[in-house]
Amino acid sequence: MKPFHSKIIIVLFFLFCFSLSLRANYLVIPMDETQKNHLKSYGVAFKALTLEYEVDWMLNYQGGAFTLSYSKEIENLCRLKGVSYYLITPSQYLAVLEEIANPSVNQDVVKLQKAPKIAVYSPKNKLPWDDAVTLVLTYAEIPYDVVYDEEVINDVLPLYDWLHLHHEDFTG
């Protein structure tokens, strides 16, 4: 093959790859059995929110998949964390939204726009692995604060968007 022809083939290949990336405008993180790392997936969705990406949480669709506008930054984060994802085009995403909107299915889309500030009600001397919730949040790399009686008395709870309480805190 002549050098000129091989250069044309290389250029056409890169143009083809570039055109595919332009068409894939959404990144989907499935949460069903195809997901390799469910807990890190939550961390990626949380990180996307902290970076001010809007995330669609697709309830009862692929196990509660997360979808957001394509971002190389989030794609790289998925790869780094071992999180399964795939790319779809705008027309494919609209078809998914139509499927979810069907009243005969028990599915919905919740728009997540802000990363919540999270607190876990737990004694200060507990380590993350002593408690299932803090263990999961730590593994998923979702930041949280531990609050206990002193913080409740000092009225710091309004500083948080989400407070996790264990049921045994009230049932003994």
Task: State each model region's role.
Residues 40-79:
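N-terminal, post-signal-peptide region of Sec/Tat-exported proteins
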Residues 20-24:
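Sec/Tat signal peptide C-region and signal peptidase I cleavage site
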Residues 1-6:
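N-terminal secretory signal peptides that target proteins for export/translocation
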Residues 17-19, 53-60, 107-111:
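Short, flexible, solvent-exposed loop/turn segments with mixed acidic/basic and small polar residues
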Residues 81-114:
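Short N-terminal or domain-adjacent regulatory/targeting segments
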Residues 9-19:
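Bacterial N-terminal signal peptides
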Residues 26-27, 32, 36, 69-76, ...:
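Helical hinge/lid and interdomain linker segments adjacent to catalytic or ligand-binding clefts
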